[in-house]
A protein has these predicted regions:
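Carbohydrate-active catalytic/glycan-binding domains of CAZyme proteins
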Residues: 1-341
Length: 341
């Protein structure tokens, strides 16, 4: 039976959306979307609770122009073959252009990769490995990677211009951490009512393998109170490139909870406690009234809670945990430690 190790502080990290936590040895590494969307940052701590106060180091900044000059979103850190990789989405700066996308239009992001071959990701050099060629040019974001039976895979969100919707989820095998070894295979597209509230979205994939089953979580709908998580499941012995291997939940598995003031939970990652418990890491807001462009509201906070499993080894997703750390409601940006800048 899973341990019920407490998450003593929630939010885990203030004003950081799309959180990714990687536990490597006894160290937790944390990255997420910065509220200015102009950089990629990294923290580390010996405990999850230590991440809020941990030093935040900027390892990469947006370009002055070109395809990586605007709206840097959803970095994820991975360790593959002894090197460190960060997948992230970036777009060309359309500020001031007459044809700049509005809030109701699709953005123009692509997926990019950074590599660091040093033993310590806070040392060495982060090298740009460029854009991941997914096979076609359209809005693409939220790449994650996992290994199964010796093969590395990439899962990401991308728009198919031939179908209704802003983004579907795709999977492909990898030749190396920045190159696909085969064509993209669609795993899911927005089809259920909960996935199409505001926007037709499947995004933010994360993969967990537990007791012979793969759980591919994702988020759907617009990033307000309707934002929620769904899940695809497959046997770890099945072919992950075969859509028939996967079963999709018809209803969301993790949703807003007014009783604890946690709204729009999603874009999750998974990590573990030192005791071996699975930890669900996600972002959420603590209020529903958003003034202006939701992208300019910095108060999507990284949260974490132990994910228990039932006697059959299936996740009990539950509901967002209540807060134990004060969370801001103003649009004022905090210093990385959570204090007022």
């Amino acid at each position: 039976m899973a341990h019920r190790a407490p998450m003593t502080m929630n939010p885990l990290v203030l004003q950081r959306a799309d959180p990714c936590v990687l536990r490597e040895g006894s160290t937790y590494y944390f990255t997420a979307s910065h509220p200015l969307y102009d950089r990629i940052t990294l923290r580390r701590a010996d405990s999850l609770d230590g991440l809020q106060a941990a030093e935040e180091v900027t390892i990469w900044r947006r370009h002055e122009s070109g395809p990586q000059s605007h709206l840097i979103w959803a970095p994820e850190i991975h360790r593959v073959g002894g090197a460190w990789y960060i997948y992230y989405a970036a777009a060309p700066d359309a500020t001031g252009r007459a044809d700049a996308p509005s809030i109701n239009e699709t953005f123009n992001h692509r997926v990019f990769v950074l590599e660091n071959t040093a033993q310590d990701p806070f040392e060495g050099e982060w090298v740009e490995r460029g854009q991941v060629d997914t096979g076609w040019e359209s809005f693409a974001l939220d790449a994650t990677s996992f290994e199964l039976a010796g093969q590395q895979y990439l899962v990401w969100a991308q728009e198919d211009l031939e179908v209704m919707g802003h983004s579907n989820l795709y999977i492909a095998p990898m030749e190396n951490p920045w190159t696909l070894a085969g064509p993209a295979v669609e795993l899911t597209r927005p089809e259920h009512e909960w996935e199409t509230r505001g926007f037709w979205v499947n995004e933010g994939p994360a993969v967990l393998e537990h007791e012979g089953t793969l759980y591919l979580t994702y988020s759907g709908a617009a990033t307000g109170i309707d934002y929620a998580m769904g899940v695809l499941t497959a046997s770890a012995d099945a072919d992950p490139l075969d859509p028939a291997s996967w079963t999709k939940s018809e209803t969301p598995v993790f949703v807003s909870d007014e009783s604890v003031e946690r709204y729009g939970p999603g874009h999750n990652s998974f990590t573990t406690t030192p005791e071996g418990d699975v930890v669900l890491v996600y972002h959420a807001r603590t209020y529903t009234e958003i003034e202006g462009d939701p992208l300019q509201d910095p108060n999507r906070h990284a949260c974490a809670q132990v994910l228990p499993f039932d006697e059959n080894g299936r996740p009990r997703w539950g509901t967002p945990a209540p807060g134990t750390r004060p969370a801001p409601r103003s649009r004022e940006l905090l210093a990385p430690t959570g204090e007022k800048a």
